[in-house]
Design a protein with these regions (language model features):
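Nucleic-acid endo/exonuclease domains
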Residues: 1-113, 117-168
Length: 168
């Protein structure tokens, strides 16, 4: 049984934001402080990613554990009321997220998901540093140059030729 009336529950649920959430702001503030520049909620990309780093061809989704059904997380507990509705809703969200990641991948974009529980104070710094490391890794991997080894017939050093010239 819900402790709130329908009207109270409606007001409570309506107040939940989808943009500029605290976890999203934490990630954005960290990225900006480390020199990463980004766009928000890009309308032309599938799923309107929370953060888009064009230079890295990477998008970041900052997901709430409850709303996106984070497996094995304390924050993801199905409500006791109307469980069928919530189970279907969260399952649809998961499927939609998976489809969006696949579409982005087929378009050549990397997608990273940061979960709300990964931004709790005890693990926040580790998560953000791992995110930074991942972005640098993506950048370097995407820009790898193929190096061709050439076989030199005679390897000589400049210093050798100078010393030989001075002897004569």
């Amino acid at each position: 049984m819900d402790k709130m009336t329908k009207e109270q529950r409606h007001r409570c649920m309506s107040a939940i934001k989808s943009k500029n959430t605290k976890p999203e702001l934490l990630v954005r503030k960290f990225l900006f402080s480390r020199g990463f520049r980004y766009r928000l909620n890009h309308p032309r990309l599938p799923g309107h990613p929370d953060i888009v780093l064009r230079k890295y061809r990477t998008v970041i989704f900052v997901n709430g554990c409850f709303w996106h059904g984070h497996e094995n997380c304390k924050s993801y507990v199905l409500p006791k009321n109307n469980t069928g509705f919530w189970k279907n809703k969260i399952e649809r969200n998961r499927n939609r997220d998976m489809e969006e990641h696949q579409k982005l991948s087929s378009m050549g974009w990397h997608s990273i998901t940061v979960w709300e529980c990964q931004l709790k104070p005890k693990v926040r710094q580790h998560t953000l540093e791992a995110l930074e490391h991942t972005l640098y890794h993506i950048y370097l991997e995407d820009r790898k140059r193929i190096s061709y080894k050439t076989i030199e017939e005679e390897s000589s050093m400049v210093a050798e030729s100078l010393t030989e010239d001075t002897k004569n």
